[in-house]
Regions:
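Carboxylate-rich, polar loop motifs that coordinate divalent cations or form catalytic acidic clusters
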Residues: 1-236
Length: 236
């Protein structure tokens, strides 16, 4: 009787294993290397993002690429096309919603609309004076999905979705901002060229920043990558 029970149990285990094995094999991660030989516009990649539609966006030194798992679609500047991206050097890609992406370039930030596949460029005071530095346009997004943009030598801006334009945010920031991040509580951390970390609280409704104190570390900061739940600072 005991032997029969063991045989029956073993039969059930084999049956379950046989049913699950194909699914387990199918679920294994697949690593695939992609390059300009596969349609990528340039092998020098500056940024990438997987959006809510599972499209992989890749920003390079020569164009923005959308990869659907099979092929690339490349977006490049075309002076004859008013709906093209403003510049081919891509630095940041941010998803505001499932239909809107924001892309920062060496000359302007761009709002891309999925339904039209068109870009709307915003130059924020640099139309007649293109920036001479790389990464002059820095993008961030708040918990309420508001787009924030810092432009070197121009200041800090917030995009007004109703008016479809950027409005200036009152601030006392220095001129040497290198980068910034916004956390889940809408606290903004600005990194200066001297490695100083500045902490502000953002209030979009009042179009202003409120400076916080007591958060500057006693050592210079050079990079501060952010995850969904934490901010990591790296110094000397």
């Amino acid at each position: 009787m005991i032997l029969r029970k063991h045989s029956y149990f073993r039969y059930i285990c084999i049956l379950i294993y046989s049913c699950l094995m194909p699914a387990l094999l199918h679920s294994q991660n697949v690593v695939k290397q992609i390059s300009n030989a596969d349609g990528l516009s340039n092998n020098s990649v500056n940024c990438f993002l997987e959006d809510s539609e599972h499209t992989l966006w890749v920003g390079t030194w020569d164009g923005l690429n959308a990869y659907n798992g099979r092929s690339f679609k490349t977006y490049s500047y075309n002076k004859k096309d008013a709906g093209s991206i403003s510049n081919n050097v891509i630095w940041q890609i941010i998803e505001q919603s499932d239909s809107i992406l924001w892309v920062s370039t060496d000359y302007g930030v761009n709002r891309w609309k999925r339904s039209t596949q068109q870009f709307t460029p915003y130059y924020l005071g640099t139309q007649n004076n293109p920036p001479k530095q790389e990464k002059s346009f820095l993008l961030g997004i708040t918990s309420g999905k508001h787009i924030i943009c810092y432009v070197k030598e121009q200041g800090l801006f917030c995009f007004d979705d109703r008016r479809q334009e950027f409005v200036s945010l009152k601030n006392d920031l220095p001129d040497d901002i290198r980068n910034f991040v916004i956390d889940s509580k809408d606290r903004i951390f600005f990194l200066t060229g001297h490695g100083q970390l500045l902490h502000y609280q953002l209030t979009v409704r009042n179009s202003c920043l409120k400076k916080k104190s007591g958060t500057v570390p006693p050592f210079p900061i050079f990079i501060f990558p952010r995850t969904a739940s934490s901010l990591t600072m790296t110094g000397r």
